[in-house]
Amino acid sequence: MNLHEYQAKELLSRYGLPVQQGILAKSPEEAAAAYDKLGGKFAVVKAQVHAGGRGKAGGVKVVKSREEAAEVAKTLIGTNLVTYQTDAAGQPVNSVLVCEDMYPVQRELYLGAVVDRGSQRVVFMVSTEGGVEIEKVAEETPEKIIKIEVDPLVGMQPFQARDAAFALGLSGAQVAAFSKLMLGSYQAFIENDFALFEVNPLALRENGELACVDGKINLDSNALYRHPELLAQRDKSQENEREVKASEFDLNYVALEGNIGCMVNGAGLAMATMDIIKLKGGQPANFLDVGGGATKERVIEAFKLILADTSVQGVLINIFGGIVRCDMIAEAIIAAVKEVNVTVPVVVRLEGNNAELGAKILDESGLKLTSAQGLNDAAEKIVAAVKAVA
């Protein structure tokens, strides 16, 4: 689960991190009032969306008057912001953050952390190349990113934070300030179950002070039950509507850009199904794992989710009956087809527990459902059916 910038800054400030002050505004009038309250020579108005690249997309503007702040807020609020990290539809802007005057600054640094599955540790990253896309730095000049692995038994050690400060070229009181900031970041990361944390840029101001100009936090969704106060900050408007609906039924759904809907039990089988659809010349419209213990109700909801995507021109159902029985899946498919009034081709491949009985139930249903023998056969049939419709 992602947090907005204003939420991330509020959380980080509780751990002693110096953050750029800002006031949330949900209307042009509130933006103008925020500008007056900040009282600087200018302010920065930032669109609050769950996506990077806001500046280049016109979502971050410098304003020099209350009228200008109101005008920028008016042009942003209620629109969708399209960045390199969003799809073509973009993300809805429901509010803006009016931030204090921070510039000019001496330098812009980068501070981030992720859970690294390779080392099975939290890994912090620092770089002198702040204020730019860190992905580009990692690709073009990876040597400019310094990584610090944190031993989970002892946590972040002060010497590690000092080493990072020296690597960034900091000196004197700046080293102590950065060390405090980095140790606070680690504490926030662990106590709140972050999956990803980023401050870009981390500004070194002309007075020698450090300030978090931006803040990005992604929370581990599997740990949200431990943080109801953070879960309450979830902004579903920033998420794919179908993915939100899927989470309510414990379905793993990811929307893609193809036209062949996929319903599979098991993540590995789901990925293999998408691969073979591509191999046969088709384009999967989604990743959807109904889980090993799929129930009739979840299969019906999965069908509804797939067909809610207007780009879907056919559906491939690929079920391996291990825990789940194929005859139960067959009954659920029939119920879903009748309830949703399916008009697109549906190809079903059933293997495993009661597969023959499941196939018999489908064949005797009187519905336009195509049975397949094996994954290759299933992929070929759905790709051919979709091309015939197109």
From Swiss-Prot:
Keywords tagged on the record: ATP-binding, Ligase, Magnesium, Metal-binding, Nucleotide-binding, Tricarboxylic acid cycle
Disulfides per UniProt: none
Binding annotation for ATP: K46, G53, R54, G55, E100, Y103, E108
Pathway: Carbohydrate metabolism; tricarboxylic acid cycle; succinate from succinyl-CoA (ligase route): step 1/1
Chain residues that bind substrate: N265, G322, I323, V324
Cofactor requirements of the protein: Mg(2+)
GO molecular function: ATP binding; magnesium ion binding; succinate-CoA ligase (ADP-forming) activity; succinate-CoA ligase (GDP-forming) activity
PROSITE patterns with a match to the protein in the record: ATP_GRASP (PS50975), SUCCINYL_COA_LIG_3 (PS01217)
Entry's EC annotation: 6.2.1.5
Catalyses which reaction(s): succinate + ATP + CoA = succinyl-CoA + ADP + phosphate; GTP + succinate + CoA = succinyl-CoA + GDP + phosphate
HAMAP family from the UniProt entry: Succ_CoA_beta
Role summary: Succinyl-CoA synthetase functions in the citric acid cycle (TCA), coupling the hydrolysis of succinyl-CoA to the synthesis of either ATP or GTP and thus represents the only step of substrate-level phosphorylation in the TCA. The beta subunit provides nucleotide specificity of the enzyme and binds the substrate succinate, while the binding sites for coenzyme A and phosphate are found in the alpha subunit.
Record-stated family: Belongs to the succinate/malate CoA ligase beta subunit family.
UniProt subunit comment: Heterotetramer of two alpha and two beta subunits.
Name of the protein: Succinate--CoA ligase [ADP-forming] subunit beta
